[in-house]
Swiss-Prot record:
Disulfide bonds join 49-63, 56-67, 62-72. It comes from the Eukaryota. One of its GO terms (cellular component) is extracellular region. Residues 20-44 form a propeptide. It comes from Conus victoriae (Queen Victoria cone). This is Conotoxin Vc6.7.
């Protein structure tokens, strides 16, 4: 009976260690995936600037150097427009 109790305790400890290791591996995998840029964002970015119709907050973020509030414009429009 004592041997069975020890065997069950060892099995429980091994299963809990395995569960902890799997959880750590899953978190590491999620962190790796969350650091990657989505394909759409990779496609819109060229050399550090945002291409046409990409999200922006200031002119210098756009390749055209023209941010219209939230999106990059294809080209800067003349001020008299």
């Amino acid at each position: 009976m004592e041997k069975l109790t020890i065997l069950l305790l060892v099995a429980a400890v091994l299963m809990s260690i395995q569960a902890v290791n799997q959880e750590k591996h899953q978190r590491a995998k999620m962190n790796l995936l969350s650091k990657r840029k989505p394909p759409a964002e990779r496609w819109w970015r060229w050399g550090g600037c945002m291409a046409w119709f990409g999200l922006c907050s200031k002119d210098s973020e756009c390749c055209s150097n023209s941010c219209d509030v939230t999106r990059c414009e294809l080209m800067p429009f003349p001020p008299d427009w």
